[in-house]
Amino acid sequence: MLMKQTFLYFLLTCVVSAQFNGYVPPEQNGGDIVVPKDFYEKFGEDFIREQEESSAPLMNPVPERDEAEAPHHPKGHHEFNDDFEDDTALEHPGFKDKLDSFLQPARDFLHTVSDRLDNIFDDDEDEHVREKRPHDSADEDAPRRKHGKCKGKGKHHKGKHAKGKGKKSHPKPEDDSVFFDDERPKHHEFDDEDREFPAHHEPGEHMPPPPMHHKPGEHMPPPPMHHEPGEHMPPPPMHHEPGEHMPPPPMHHEPGEHMPPPPMHHEPGEHMPPPPMHHEPGEHMPPPPMHHEPGEHMPPPPMHHEPGEHMPPPPMHHEPGEHMPPPPMHHEPGEHMPPPPFKHHELEEHEGPEHHRGPEDKEHHKGPKDKEHHKGPKDKEHHKGPKDKEHHKGPKDKEHHKGPKDKEHHKGPKDKEHHQGPKEKHNERPEQNMQSSHELLVIEAFADLINSVPVEEIAEEFSRFLDTLGIEYYGNIPVHIQENAPKDSSIPPLFEFDDDLELSDLTPEQFAYLEMLKAEGIDPMTAFRDQSHPAKPSNAQPADSSRPYAVFSQEENGEHVNLKAFPDHTLRVKDSKPESLGIDTVKQYTGYLDVEDDRHLFFWFFESRNDPENDPVVLWLNGGPGCSSLTGLFMELGPSSINIETLKPEYNPHSWNSNASVIFLDQPINTGFSNGDDSVLDTVTAGKDVYAFLNLFFAKFPQYAHLDFHIAGESYAGHYIPQFAKEIMEHNQGANFFVASGYEMEKQYINLKSVLIGNGLTDPLVQYYFYGKMACESPYGPIMSQEECDRITGAYDTCAKLITGCYQTGFTPVCIGASLYCNNAMIGPFTKTGLNIYDIREECRDQEHLCYPETGAIESYLNQEFVQEALGVEYDYKGCNTEVNIGFLFKGDWMRKTFRDDVTAILEAGLPVLIYAGDADYICNYMGNEAWTDALEWAGQREFYEAELKPWSPNGKEAGRGKSFKNFGYLRLYEAGHMVPFNQPEASLEMLNSWIDGSLFA
């Protein structure tokens, strides 16, 4: 099951990657809503047609066409699944065309992946040859990695359809469609009487020489298929007219037999015969031609040689665009290898064949790395030597070498089936994708799968799944019609819309992704819901300039702050009285960071209760991604909490602003009170907005700019904080000049002193391993059966492959697949326990609000009109935004190693880093956090790893255990869940204060 699920992830990421990488034209992307049958019937065709005619169409219907134009298929025949009994999905106009368009990128991509695998990993002998050919194509200069053999199937792989009418043929490049049974090109048989040479000769019999000259277009007879020892072989013709087909040499020779030399000269476009496929020990190999005309096809060398056999040298010179024959695919020990050509190909397109483009042709003839066509003695699909029954069968071979009637393989200069070149649609890919890290996609993450799954059948398998699910295309949109859904109530239904706002804005590709997982018995939304801090958003109220308290209103008494270094960013500060809410008596500021007029980040600043002129400044960030930092304000470390019964603020004596000024920032866009038409769905981009905000904030409030500055956060802030800190440190090396309120400011320098990450996700490759351990070996006892824990741990092998693929390639579709698989396999089983995933000691009390009723109370409080008026906010409050969460996932942001590497970078720069974790949390548990800090590569890794965990007793009572070396520290806190300040407010405040003053591990 795991193998099949992983295969689905890979297959679907290929389709998604085709969209991301531009393999599908923009007009094929379609609309943005997937419609189930009940939704479709609810609105009806008239509504959809109206939306189609509007400026923002809901769908893009297929135009009607006449019956004569509709594709005809014999009764009982189905294009994608011969076993599928219902024609409903295939009767829709344009279904085949649309499905083909949807699948074609996957086909192209998978064939490219297969070719890449064969190209990158070759035998040691071929590696040695490549090292001696430094001027070969750029593709050979790419980094090499040795892995197990990859058995990508070539074009003559028979697959499971090799017998009977079900056998598939490759489509002609000028047609995107796939050949089905009734339209597959027919093979032409070749009868023995058509041959002009005898099929066999007795020993000593003299072979007649071929004609010395042939008229244009005349077909050359093939030589005998077998010769007895000592028999004399006739020489080939001395001259051929343009376009004349050259006969192939004998397929087998006995020891000592003399091989005839090839022709001395060929006309442009003439097809050169291939050399013998096998030679006996001591047999002399004929040399290749000394000269070839432009565009002439060079014959490949023999596929196998016996020990000691002498290899003929390649031609000394080739014309521009001429195709060079590949060297032998296999050599015996001590065998002499022919030298490479002394002059390399010019990048020109030659006459006749359209598929041989020289060194850049990566689809068919790839030189020494080409395993799709010439694979030597191990190639069981194409050239098998004298025992090859599939390719060279002697005089009775009717499938491949058919003499003058063979139209499938040797067509000469007019061959369009085998030599396609620049018109091949499979080659029309962005150049930057041809020589990038994409070639490592399957190698690192899916190598074992590719070895066991025939590449030729992947697209067909994908079609079968679509048929099974009832996926149809309505216009350019895959529509799931639930008409044929199973009636068994024990089977969970597929995704439905109804009032589920979490799925309402999924793109068609994302929806198809989730449907596939659901069909395999996986509920991906469980992982999203539990790991992303989602809460159903309230209906957003658009900004209204009629509100007198709106920040942007003309009557506002606030201030706009601009900086020369950030022309697209503006800070709007509300000069109001948020302290009127009774949250705290200290000075407070609220406002927005505006980004290009369509993104607005909300902030709330609280001055220190102690000494605001000298106390440090702390930026607090909650995670998610997509969860508001105001959750931290009112539930964890802010000046007040919200009573769940009265919705009144209650004073918090252990607030982190007791000895520091604190900024609570809602980021990224559409988190909390932040809003905008545009989206930021990756950590790196979010970091640029945060850096701009800090510059603008300290420009507006220079009294805080010189103070020590720290960044703290939890959960997905394990991604945010390392990246944001790195962004600040890089910019601190430069100079920025600002304009604030009309006067010039001095060079801005953000005085970053340290970072703190609580129960964060930073290194998934290490952390995901400990879900099984935490489930059965936590200090609070097992929460699952040992069998379930073993099952989770067993799934880690596949999970680790996927995460490693993301780490090594950074390729978004691989990272997406890793997130989907690992979140469901490793975290999904926890949902059956009914416990709080953020604190395994408790039951989940409020599923809609992160299992905590406190978060629901916060949302209700902040959506009161008088509260919003005091804050000057423009939208209703969203505790957690699932759309942002899913957006980060489908950008591949979850599983990248960038953030772990950022921790290394800031440690090496001397910035102190504290990783702390409550030991009752499951989602980002202390076991995983302790393990990744031990495994982190940095200058002090050994000393940190060897350091012992020591008790931490802030008030004479042990509250945790920790260790440190130089500027890196780790602290485990007892009796605390995911939100440490919520469970241990006093200990967490002491942790912050002692960390800031340097006494935490003293």
UniProtKB/Swiss-Prot annotation:
Please give the Pfam families that the UniProt record associates with this protein: Peptidase_S10 (PF00450)
Which residue positions are annotated as catalytic? 715, 921, 978
Provide the residue span(s) of the region labelled Disordered. Answer: 51-91, 124-436, 527-546
Q: Please report the propeptide residues according to the UniProt annotation.
A: 19-521
What are the GO BP annotations of this UniProt entry?
protein catabolic process in the vacuole; zymogen activation
Q: List the disulfide bonds.
A: 627-880, 776-789, 799-822, 806-815, 844-851
Map out region (9 X 13 AA tandem repeats of M-H-H-E-P-G-E-H-M-P-P-P-P) in residue numbers: 225-341
The subcellular location is: Vacuole
Keyword rRNA-binding set for record? no
Q: Where does substrate bind?
A: 924, 979
Q: Name one GO molecular function term.
A: serine-type carboxypeptidase activity
Q: Which domain of life is it from?
A: Eukaryota
Q: Does the keyword Cytoplasm apply?
A: no
Ranges of compositional bias, category Basic residues: 144-170
Q: What is its EC number?
A: 3.4.16.5
Listed under GO cellular component are: fungal-type vacuole
Q: Where are the sequence repeats?
A: 225-237, 238-250, 251-263, 264-276, 277-289, 290-302, 303-315, 316-328, 329-341, 361-369, 370-378, 379-387, 388-396, 397-405, 406-414, 415-423
Main localization is other
Q: Which reaction does it catalyse?
A: Release of a C-terminal amino acid with broad specificity
* Stated role: Involved in degradation of small peptides. Digests preferentially peptides containing an aliphatic or hydrophobic residue in P1' position, as well as methionine, leucine or phenylalanine in P1 position of ester substrate.
Q: How does it assemble?
A: Heterodimer of two subunits of 32 kDa and 19 kDa derived from the precursor protein and linked by a disulfide bond.
What PANTHER family has UniProt attached to this entry? SERINE CARBOXYPEPTIDASE CTSA-4.1, SERINE PROTEASE FAMILY S10 SERINE CARBOXYPEPTIDASE
Protein name, UniProt field: Carboxypeptidase Y
